[in-house]
Curated annotation (Swiss-Prot):
GO terms for cellular component: Golgi apparatus. It is found in: Golgi apparatus. Keywords: Golgi apparatus. RAB2B effector protein which promotes cytosolic DNA-induced innate immune responses. Regulates IFN responses against DNA viruses by regulating the CGAS-STING signaling axis. Residues 1-22, 60-92 are annotated as: Disordered. Interacts (via N-terminus) with RAB2B (in GTP-bound form). It comes from the Eukaryota. It comes from Homo sapiens (Human). Belongs to the GARIN family. This is Golgi-associated RAB2 interactor protein 5A. Coiled coil: none annotated. One of its GO terms (biological process) is defense response to virus. It holds the Pfam family GARIL_Rab2_bd. Residues 1-16 have a biased composition (Pro residues).
Length: 247
């Protein structure tokens, strides 16, 4: 295991620590300038798209083909955007997609993105399933430990996403800020607790974070099911673990 990218990282609190000790936030651990450490080659869209092989029948997975016309989305959630991503229920780009389209990240403007809002938690402080997760609210009314996580493809020719994006509210003004960009080959994603819609994110620096989906109750199970199918497609699940669960 190589040396950590950021030597000033603090270790998470040991099991049994008092609930008054706050879990380190992703935005505190991951510095806001990830582009100095990770270089992603962006392929410009071709004049014509190559003919891709038909994906295996998967009941509407997150295959990132740029076919025209409506297709079943993840979990049968209606139509999808170009690239096979599940379309927003309102028909408008979601928060992370709008942020990337604001002009600061021109290379990501046309990337199809699948994203969701999560709340970071520590299983030692908020053990599941005996206690609920209480978001940390700032003076600006924003959820301090909220994390917007999305996956994207750096090329329209890819059938699956190859980038993981992490964003959260800035401490200064509460506006969304991109603080993590990682190739998916350097990240491991697991289902931590399916019943509570919780994911485990393990970086190549051996740091592990836990995220719980923050979505309306009526759409939460369907949205989390999309992430489960994505994880299954990416083959990040351990063969020795219980299906869809990382012990």
């Amino acid at each position: 295991m190589g040396p950590p990218l950021w030597p000033d990282l603090q270790e998470p609190p040991p099991p049994g620590t008092s609930s008054q000790i706050r879990s380190p936030l992703l935005c505190d651990v991951i510095k806001p300038a990830p582009h100095h450490d990770v270089t992603v080659r962006v392929v410009p869209p071709p004049r014509f798209l190559p003919l891709l092989l038909r994906p295996l029948p998967s009941d509407g997975d997150i295959a990132m083909r740029r076919d025209r016309g409506p297709k079943p989305a993840l979990g049968g959630a209606g139509e999808v955007e170009p690239g096979g991503m599940a379309a927003s229920p309102t028909g408008r780009p979601r928060r992370l997609q709008r942020y990337l389209q604001s002009g600061e990240f021109d290379q990501f403007r046309d990337f199809p993105i699948f994203e969701s809002n999560f709340v970071q938690f520590c299983p030692d402080i908020y053990p599941a399933p005996t206690s609920d997760l209480w978001p940390q609210v700032t003076r600006l009314g924003e959820v301090a430990n909220e994390v917007t996580m999305g996956v994207a493809a750096s090329s329209p020719a890819l059938e699956l996403p190859d980038l993981l994006l992490l964003a959260g509210p800035a401490k200064e003004n509460g506006h969304l800020q991109l603080f993590g960009l990682f190739p998916l080959k350097f990240v491991q994603l697991f289902v931590h607790d399916k019943s509570r819609c919780q994911l485990e994110v393990k970086l190549n620096t051996s740091r592990t974070f836990y995220l719980q989906l923050r979505a309306p109750l009526k759409t939460r199970d369907r949205e989390f099911g999309q992430w489960v199918r994505l994880l299954y497609r990416l083959r990040f699940l351990s063969a020795s673990a219980v299906p869809f669960t990382q012990e």
